[in-house]
Regions:
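Phosphodiester-processing cores and adjacent nucleic acid-binding clamps
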Residues: 1-287
Length: 287
C-alpha cells in the first residue's frame, strides 16, 4: 500500500493524474492507496470518484457471478467456480485512503517569522468518518488562519482534532527527520513522544530510501535518508513505535521523471541547464 502519494493537485510539484494512479495501482496488484497532496485535499473528490468507478466494475462482475450462484439450473461445478471467482474479485476491491501531507508549524500558526515557520511536513490519513471530518477541518483552518508561504497547522490543532487520524512522520522534511539532521536527537525523541501521547498506536515512523543512478538526479538525498533512517529505526525500537516504508510518489511511471524534472524547473523558476537548481532523485514514481 502506497501511503505517501502526490497527484497533480500538489501544485507544480506532483505530476500524476488521479485516474492514472488508480489504474497503475490496480494493474500492479495493489488494492489500497492513499492520496496525500501537499497542504490540500483538492484531489479527494476525483480520487473517490475514480475509486468508485473502478470498484463499480468489480462489483458488476461479482453480481454476474452471484447470478450463477443463485441459478437453480446451474450445476454444482459452475456454482463452485462462481463462488471461487466471487472470493477472488472481492480481493480486488480498491480501498482509497484519504489523506494530506500537511505543513505543521514548529511553534504556532500565529508565528510567522522566517523560513523555519513555513512548517514541517506531516502525513495525515483518515481512518474513519470522524477522521475525514477532522482532516477537512485541519485543511480548512490551515488555509483560513495558518497560511504563511504554505497552509499550516500546528500541534495544538492536531491535539484538538486528533480523533480518527493516522499520522506518519513524513519525508526528510518531517519534524523528526529535520531535528535529526540538525543534530537534535533528543528533540526528535521528544517530538516522537508528543505524537505517541496524542495518537498512540496510530503514529508511525516513516522511512524512505531513494537510491538512484539516474543522470542529473539528486545523489545526496539517499545518503541523508540512510543517516536519518538509522536514528529513526533506533527511536522506533526504543519507543516501541511501528515503522512504515514509503516512496515519495510524484509521478506514475519511471519514464515520467524527465518531464517531472522540467516541472520542477517551472516551480522553482530555474533554467534547465542551471547547475545549482533543485533536482529530485527520479525515483519518485509509483513502484
Amino acid at each position: 500500500t502506497h501511503l505517501h502519494v502526490h497527484s497533480h493537485f500538489s501544485i507544480l510539484d506532483g505530476m500524476s493524474k488521479v485516474p492514472d494512479l488508480i489504474d497503475k495501482c490496480t494493474r500492479s496488484g495493489m488494492y489500497s492507496m492513499a492520496l496525500t497532496d501537499h497542504g490540500n485535499m483538492f484531489g479527494i473528490k476525483e480520487f473517490a470518484d475514480a475509486a468508485n468507478k473502478y470498484n463499480g466494475k468489480i462489483k458488476d462482475k461479482i453480481k454476474e457471478q452471484e447470478k450463477v450462484l443463485n441459478d437453480k439450473e446451474a450445476d454444482d461445478a459452475k456454482k463452485d467456480d462462481a463462488a471461487v471467482e466471487i472470493d477472488h474479485l472481492k480481493t480486488k476491491i480498491l480501498k482509497p485512503i484519504i489523506g494530506m501531507e500537511a505543513y505543521c508549524a514548529p511553534v504556532s500558526i500565529d508565528k510567522r517569522d522566517g523560513r523555519a515557520d513555513r512548517g514541517y511536513h506531516l502525513i495525515i490519513l483518515a481512518k474513519n468518518k470522524q477522521g475525514y471530518k477532522n482532516l477537512c477541518k485541519l485543511s480548512s483552518i490551515a488555509y483560513i488562519d495558518g497560511y504563511y508561504y504554505n497552509p499550516r497547522i500546528d500541534h495544538s490543532l492536531l491535539e484538538k482534532y486528533h480523533e480518527g487520524l493516522i499520522i506518519c512522520s513524513a519525508c526528510l522534511g518531517g519534524e523528526l527527520p529535520q531535528k535529526i539532521m540538525n543534530g537534535d536527537i533528543e528533540g526528535a525523541e521528544q517530538s516522537l513522544h508528543w505524537f505517541k501521547n496524542i495518537f498512540g498506536d496510530d503514529f508511525y515512523i516513516e522511512i524512505q530510501r531513494h537510491k538512484t543512478d539516474k543522470p542529473n538526479a539528486d545523489q545526496e538525498t539517499f545518503e541523508r535518508q540512510q543517516e536519518v533512517n538509522k536514528v529513526l529505526i533506533d527511536l522506533a525500537r526504543k519507543t516501541n513505535t511501528k515503522i512504515v516504508a514509503t516512496n515519495d510518489v510524484h509521478f506514475v511511471e519511471e519514464e515520467h521523471s524527465e518531464a517531472h524534472d522540467r516541472l520542477i524547473c517551472l516551480s522553482t523558476g530555474k533554467d534547465f541547464d542551471d547547475p545549482n537548481r533543485m533536482h529530485y532523485t527520479k525515483q519518485e514514481w509509483l513502484k
